[in-house]
Amino acid sequence: MSYDELELDKLGDEKSALFFLISDTDTTYNFLVALAFSQMFNLLCERADNTYGGRLPYHVRVLWDEAANTGQVPGLEKIVAVIRSREISLTLFYQAMSQCKALYKDHSETIMGNMDSIVFLGGREASTLKDISENWLGKATISMQTEGRSRGQSESYSQNMQRLGRELMTTSEIKIGRAHV
């Protein structure tokens, strides 16, 4: 190939789609896809800055399915922190958050922290369930009413109302899934 036929830097110039298809069983060429992603983000940021005053004319949405199977993209923790302002968004798809942690080690928290949303389609991996429950869903305030009645020489009745904090969904509730809720 004597010329650039992918033209990764021009993805934000007009409406277009680009697909990378790789084997999910043979990892031989995964590094090429990781390299292409790295190059694409760098070229698009450079083009946004140098040609369009900091923002691409067309939003570039990267839907990166099976992100754990493409290999590590160098500097992804920095890329995810700066692309949004340039009209580039990134959605990473993992089977479990531990895949991101295994691939990016200490930088996985930075990467996940720069994601503005999460879609969880189910799973049972404990650290993923805990992270979703504690860090993504958070807590809710619930009201709990207790009543008591005692009988003896004279009957007494008590009613108590308390406000308590609890996880919006516990790990057990997340694990059950929507079919049982």
PLM regions with names:
Residues E7-L8, K15-S16, K78-A81, Q99-R178:
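P-loop NTPase motor core of the ASCE superfamily
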Residues A68, A96-S98:
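Acidic, glycine-rich active-site loops and adjacent beta-strand->loop/helix elements
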